[in-house]
């Protein structure tokens, strides 16, 4: 089971958990909550497998056997695995907050004043979709050693800052229930982090590609 496949699968699972954690705000079903918990466990298991493979490879200098061109790629993949684990962990944290909220509502310890604002929720889903797309592109660029693709990802991240600020202003302008507002801010922050992870992976891909090009010139 190649480490690249493990990382790909981890990313799919973690992003799915993140998406479900946002959907769970409107559909607070036990099944959806459990889906995020299960996904977090699956991502963790794959993460442990990937780390063991990396540790085994670096101890025996088996970078070529793992499909790497230089030993430095061990660190790159370790960072990516950490980022993906953080995505699933943040999704689980959101679900834990929603579970606490729902329990307080069920026990009538808490009364939500208003329904979820559709405009805010729709824009949050849109921002989250952009975050997912950016992260998926960063993983593809890393695997393909795509220098130009990595550059585009960094530019896109900068362009999404305005969209993020607009969403923050929209949330601030609305009279949201404080409990719902806190969870919405958590979800927005999780989406922003995914974009930052994508940017970091793209920057690492750029650095790796430049180093490989320079090395090839030195050899010639």
Placement of each model-derived feature along the sequence:
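Cytosolic, long alpha-helical scaffolding segments
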Residues: 1-220
